[in-house]
Structures are given as C-alpha cells and as structure tokens.
Amino acid sequence: MRTLSLPLALTARISPVVVLAAAGWALTSGPAATPAAQKESAPRAADETPSGASTAAASKAFSTSPAPCGSISAATIKSLVPGAKTAGKEIPSTDTALRRTCSWNALKGYDYRWLDVSFEITESDQAAAKSYKENIAEKSGGGSVPGVGDAGYSVVNLTTEDKQQTREGVVMIQASNALVTVTYNGSDFESKKAPSTDEINKGAIRAAKEAVKALESGQRT
C-alpha cells in the first residue's frame, strides 16, 4: 500500500483536546471552514417553538449533566467510529455539573471519523430555548429533527482543505432546560473524498437520540 501524507486537517482533528480545554466550553465544528465550504442537508426548517416547553417562568427538569462518555452505547461507537476506544475521552470543563463533553476519534486505514457529544444544563426551559434558537440561527440550511426532545435541528456541511474533503454533521437538541449537541464528521485520506451526507446525518442523529435518552433516564430535579 502506498504511503500518503496526511493533510493538516487530520493533524488538527486528531488532537483537539488542548484547544477545547483552553476554551473551557466550545461546540466543536470540525476543521476550519474555508471559502470552499458547502452547506448541504435537508431543506431549512421553520423556526419552531418547542412543543413540550413549560410555561412556568423558571421550569427546570435537570440539575446536572450526565456522564457524557457513558451516554453513547459501545455498539454505536463501534459503528460510527471504527477503531475508536469505546470509553471515549472527556474534555475538561470549568463546571462539570453544568457542561460536559466526550469525544471519540479514530483513523482506520485511511478512513477518519470523529464524534463528540456535549451536554449543557441551563437555569430554565426558557433559557435553553433561547440558547437553542440563537445557535440554530447561526447555521445555514439544515432541517428539523422530529421526535427527539422538545426541539431538534440537524445540518451537514462539506469543507475542503488542501484538496481533502471533510463532511460534518451537527445535531442540536433542546430537552427541557438541557441542550445536547452532537458533532460527527469523517474523511477518506486515500480518495480525498468525504462520506455521504446521508451517512453523516444519520450517524449524528443516531448518537443524538442516544444522548437524549441517557439525559432523560438520569436524575431529574
């Protein structure tokens, strides 16, 4: 098998922990977007009011974040990130009661995959809904994810750096006063291509559903 030099995108993605730790709390967005970035996904979803949001002024279902590295099943990790250690790696947070993130990544042959799941616990349903709407307003394209939490949104982007494609999916879910964000991306460093939009989108949504289930099955206030 011929030897291929890996582009800068791989180096940046294999060791993201230091960068995220310095930030304290950040939603990963994959390799830096370039002017060649393309937005792709289902049609844009209309702004939705979370159907299950409480009308109480300061309603709050969750008081702490669940253990993020235990929120995704080993079977799902093996499927989405072949070759990764199923235990994952938790990224340091300034307040683990309110914000926690776990990541998994692996290079198997020339196929690279990255997955992370983040939980943020806000002071109320209303605060979570506001943050959710602000986050999706910053995105372009995308569509709703029905049947998960109170509101859900998914978007898939394609970026190209050093002629290497990377496709990344981001799923954001609001569940009561909690926000769950999943980032899933991949690249093929032999073909220089990226996995299909369908593969990345379905993988991110699969992980998001498991993360929300772990949140909801945990301790409530």
Give the role of each language-model region.
Residues 3-17, 24-221:
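A small/polar (G/S/T-enriched), proline-flanked helix-loop surface module common
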